[in-house]
């Protein structure tokens, strides 16, 4: 049996900030198998973002082996964000709004 997907402590903050600037956000963390945490639609573009908690030590922010494999094998865009500003950069916004 698969264990419940963990949600990073900052995921709700990042999702709320993305929605505030007009992005649509679909959580994907429950998919598992290394799939990124969220799918973001913004200005007619799609973005996959893996969320890591920037407040945790670097060793706790590393991609898991499944995430590394998924990122390596995916033939499209995928980003990692540790905070709102990095999530905005991932969708081509330059600063927090």
Feature names for model-found ranges:
Residues 1-97:
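Catalytic phosphate/metal-binding cores of nucleic-acid and nucleotide-processing enzymes, i.e., regions
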């Amino acid at each position: 049996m698969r264990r419940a997907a963990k949600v990073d402590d900052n995921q709700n903050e990042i999702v709320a900030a993305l929605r505030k600037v007009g992005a649509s956000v679909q959580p994907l963390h429950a998919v598992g198998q290394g799939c990124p945490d969220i799918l973001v639609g913004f200005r007619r573009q799609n973005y996959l973002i893996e969320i890591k908690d920037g407040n945790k030590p670097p060793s706790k922010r590393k991609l898991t082996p499944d995430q590394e494999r998924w990122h390596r094998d995916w033939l499209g865009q995928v980003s990692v964000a540790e905070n709102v500003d990095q999530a905005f950069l991932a969708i081509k916004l330059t600063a927090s709004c």
